[in-house]
């Protein structure tokens, strides 16, 4: 039981996290390094026709394997599933995920405009999303990245950093790694901001499940709107950019606020 006079350590500051569920920061660094190294090798060696799915699979297979092996060799509190961040958090984190995932994609459109992105880079990204069917695009570029990338960058890295570091510092470091992993100027700033917000949720929730939802929804909305699958919505956004921007900012701020608010203080009886 926590005393009101107990010093605010990092674990108390983040509160809500199940003690011992995240992996040790040094182990997390090793897992992320091994995962990204394997990812680069696969991206170079695998045929382009399957490189997206193969490279994404690495982001899930390597961390899962590493955590399972480490738990067998060095028993630690909690299960491997909890260590990966695959535990159910309070419902408010899923509400936050919906609020953030549904609107952050629109805010990031304005951030992309600030970057030195060439027309060719924009065209390549657009063709990548437009070429497959809508269902295939949603699976390849929304569902799969949401699960695989969140597992390593939020389930492993962000939660591990959240143990010794303050919330904003841990979220900032993990977001920077996530942004660098993209290897794309066009995606650098949007993924940095998205990664920071998702890390806040993952650390507070001690779970990657809500961030998977937010990530999948963010990507799905970007894909659907980029392909003009919802012409009425696209037309409204084009005619009311200020209202859309204000609404998106408010929704994202709401999601962040309910994610980072401190839980009720435990009073000794």
Spans of features found by a protein language model:
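Alpha-helical transmembrane segments in multi-pass membrane proteins
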Residues: 27-74, 92-97, 243-245
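Alpha-helical transmembrane segments and their helix-entry boundary regions
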Residues: 52, 83, 93-94, 156, ...
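Juxtamembrane helix-loop-helix connectors linking adjacent transmembrane helices
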Residues: 51, 80-151, 158-159, 163, ...
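Hydrophobic residues within alpha-helical transmembrane segments
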Residues: 99, 173-177, 189, 213, ...
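Membrane interfacial helix motifs at helix-loop boundaries and amphipathic/re-entrant anchors
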Residues: 39-55, 110-136, 185-186, 224-244
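Membrane-interface helix/loop boundary segments of multi-pass membrane proteins
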Residues: 148-173, 200-207
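Short, Lys/Arg-rich, polar N-terminal cytosolic tail immediately upstream
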Residues: 1-21
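C-terminal membrane module of polytopic membrane proteins
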Residues: 216-269
